[in-house]
């Protein structure tokens, strides 16, 4: 059974992050210390109310990769050393939930990317992960994997993605709402 993938629209989410340009080979050793810096800031100097129950996040801006590792927060803030204010992107996304070992997280990314391409969606660039809270009895956690999509891009199934995440049929090369205006009465 494949990994279920859905398309939806998400709002930008403010984050406190440490940003870096790394290689994929060095990223596994770098993300932990980056995240530790963010948590030190949140515990020892963040503005009151900045953190209320956000999750750990990793944003991959490109293939370099330029990455941001941090935590969801409630608003933007002034930078404090290496910890800066940023945001997870908003807009149309393909998303799946990873429930297996972290070592297999790449499989979920491949599933989201492959599913999107197979349906004619154009990937828009950034992708990110939002780490859920650990289960108190097992220590296991889920990871939501998001890939940005170009809105309105027609799919091979004869549908188009709306900016709100809706999927509408294509009629005469136009989304149904537009196509219906151009049909003879």
Task: Enumerate the predicted regions with their spans.
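A solvent-exposed interaction/effector surface
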Residues: 1-185
């Amino acid at each position: 059974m494949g990994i279920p993938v859905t398309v939806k629209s998400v709002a930008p989410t403010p984050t406190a992050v440490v940003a870096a340009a790394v290689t994929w080979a060095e990223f596994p050793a770098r993300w932990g210390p980056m995240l530790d810096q963010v948590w030190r800031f949140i515990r020892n100097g963040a503005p009151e109310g900045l953190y209320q129950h956000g999750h750990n996040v990793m944003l991959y801006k490109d293939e370099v990769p330029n990455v941001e590792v941090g935590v969801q927060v409630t608003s933007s803030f002034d930078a404090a050393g290496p910890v800066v204010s940023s945001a997870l992107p908003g807009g149309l996304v393909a998303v799946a939930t990873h429930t297996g070992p972290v070592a297999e997280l790449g499989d979920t990314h491949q599933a989201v990317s492959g599913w999107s391409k197979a349906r004619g969606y154009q990937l828009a660039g950034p992708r990110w992960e939002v780490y859920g809270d650990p289960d108190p009895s097992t220590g296991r956690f889920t990871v939501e994997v998001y890939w940005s999509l170009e809105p309105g891009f027609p799919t091979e199934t004869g549908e188009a993605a709306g900016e709100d995440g809706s999927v509408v049929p294509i009629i005469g090369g136009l989304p149904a709402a537009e196509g219906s205006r151009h049909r003879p009465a």
